[in-house]
């Protein structure tokens, strides 16, 4: 099954400047189940508000556990993590 993971931050001015960015990136890159990742922006298209991932996994619980172990979450940078099952119909990247 595929899952969308939305990780929201209260104040996240520059993920690349965050000291744990390398650890966060390596954590998600090492996952064989991460299909896509992206930064999340506010409606203004400029203000960074978090991250978005599409993952393949056996269960919702597996994705939640993986997301909770993200170095950014362990450092309390994420205010809220939301995981939803998705059914991709069209991809035009």
Positions of PLM-derived features:
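Conserved, structured core segments of small domains
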Residues: 1-93
